[in-house]
Structure formats: C-alpha cells, structure tokens
UniProtKB/Swiss-Prot annotation:
GO cellular component, one term: cytoplasm
Species name: Methanobrevibacter ruminantium (strain ATCC 35063 / DSM 1093 / JCM 13430 / OCM 146 / M1) (Methanobacterium ruminantium)
Protein name per Swiss-Prot or TrEMBL: Proteasome subunit beta
Swiss-Prot/TrEMBL keywords: Autocatalytic cleavage, Cytoplasm, Hydrolase, Protease, Proteasome, Threonine protease, Zymogen
Signal peptide extent: none
PANTHER family: ATP-DEPENDENT PROTEASE SUBUNIT HSLV, METALLOPROTEASE TLDD
Entry's family note: Belongs to the peptidase T1B family.
Subunit structure: The 20S proteasome core is composed of 14 alpha and 14 beta subunits that assemble into four stacked heptameric rings, resulting in a barrel-shaped structure. The two inner rings, each composed of seven catalytic beta subunits, are sandwiched by two outer rings, each composed of seven alpha subunits. The catalytic chamber with the active sites is on the inside of the barrel. Has a gated structure, the ends of the cylinder being occluded by the N-termini of the alpha-subunits. Is capped at one or both ends by the proteasome regulatory ATPase, PAN.
EC number from the UniProt entry: 3.4.25.1
Length: 207
C-alpha cells in the first residue's frame, strides 16, 4: 500500500472519566523517515457531545470524520435527539466494515448513559475501553496510562495524565512529536484546550 498522504507515526490517547472524556495527541505527520507535517490536526469535533482522533491516510481519515459528523446530524434530524455514543461507534464501524480504509480512530464523548470511548480499526472492528492509545508511540503512552489511571478520575486530572502519556511517547518514539493537542467532552460539550492551557500543564509536569 502506498504511503502517500499517510500519517505513519501518530500517537493518540483517550481516557474515560467520571465527568467526561479526554483526548490527546501529538502533531507530527510522517511519511517513512520524512517529517511531512508539524501541525497535523488529529482530534476532531464530531458533534457537541462526540469527538474523535485519527491516524492513517489523511484522505481516508478526513472523509471518515465528515461522514460520521453528517450521520450524527442526520440522526438528530430524523429522531429529534442526539445519537448515543454506542450508536455513533456502530455507524462508524459499519462504514469501515463496508469500505475498509487505512485509518484507525478513537470515538468518544458523553450521552445519557455517561462517558465512553471506542477504538475502531481499519476493517471496522470496535472495542470499548476505559483508556486507549493508538499509534507508533502507544507502547510508551500505555506505560503512563496503566500507572496513573484510576477509577473515578476527573476530566481535569485525566488531562494531565493524557499529556504525560503523549509526552512519554514523543520522548521515545521518533515518529511522534511537534507539540500537543488536547480536547475534552463533558455535559457542557466539546472543548479544545488552548496552547497556553496545555503549556501550563506541561510546565507543571516538568517542575
């Protein structure tokens, strides 16, 4: 398979919290040994209560995000209510199962049943978990997640854990780096953290 327009080195993290979910990623997009892009967007708002992360083919990933977002909007129009996280993940799984793509995604958020995160592979395989990491630096990220995750963790606390996990990946994985993206979804909706907010947390971690 050609690696043209492909993220080969992504590291992403998703954490389920008692009051929402947290997503984090680094920003490097690599093609083989080339750092092709230093400010790649890897976290997407799907709806007010749903977000997703991507790794894989740029074209496939962007198309998938647009289709999922359209499906969630269509569901609201047809049913007069927001789609559940399980249903949104199932729709995404069906899309990938019927048309496999070179992409891996995390999808999660908050609905009437609480917070949840699902991992989807290129063929549509779907797994729900409390915390998940994908990509070339996931081994290093999982070390932090396994050590620092605990039941009933809050979004605020998980944000620092997620940044620590991505930081560990960028320090050891040559295909991950060039900054951080962090977002959360709570009952109040989707929020992407500003660079200054992320930098303040990193400074706290380093102190």
């Amino acid at each position: 398979m050609s690696n043209k327009n492909t993220f080969e080195g992504t590291t992403t993290v998703g954490i389920t919290c008692k009051d929402g979910v947290v997503f984090a990623s680094e920003r490097r997009a690599s093609m083989g040994n080339l750092v092709a892009h230093k400010v790649a967007e890897k976290i997407f708002k799907i709806d007010n209560h749903i977000a997703a992360t991507i790794a894989g083919s740029v074209a496939d990933a962007q198309t998938l995000m647009k289709v999922i977002s359209a499906e969630t909007s269509l569901y609201r129009l047809r049913n007069g209510k927001d789609i559940s996280l399980e249903a949104a993940a199932a729709v995404s799984s069906n899309i990938l199962h019927s048309s496999p793509a070179y992409v891996q995604t995390l999808i999660g958020g908050v609905d009437d049943t609480g917070a949840s995160i699902y991992s989807l592979d290129a063929a549509g395989g779907m797994i729900k978990d409390t915390f998940i990491s994908t990509g070339s630096g996931s081994t290093f990220a999982y070390g932090v997640l396994e050590d620092r995750f605990y039941e009933d963790i809050t979004v605020e606390e998980a944000t620092e854990v997620a940044i620590r996990a991505i930081k560990a990946a960028t320090e050891r994985d040559t295909f991950s780096g060039n900054g951080f993206l962090v977002a959360n979804v709570t009952k109040d909706g989707f929020k992407m953290l500003e660079k200054e907010e992320v930098d303040a947390i990193i400074e706290k971690i380093n102190s």
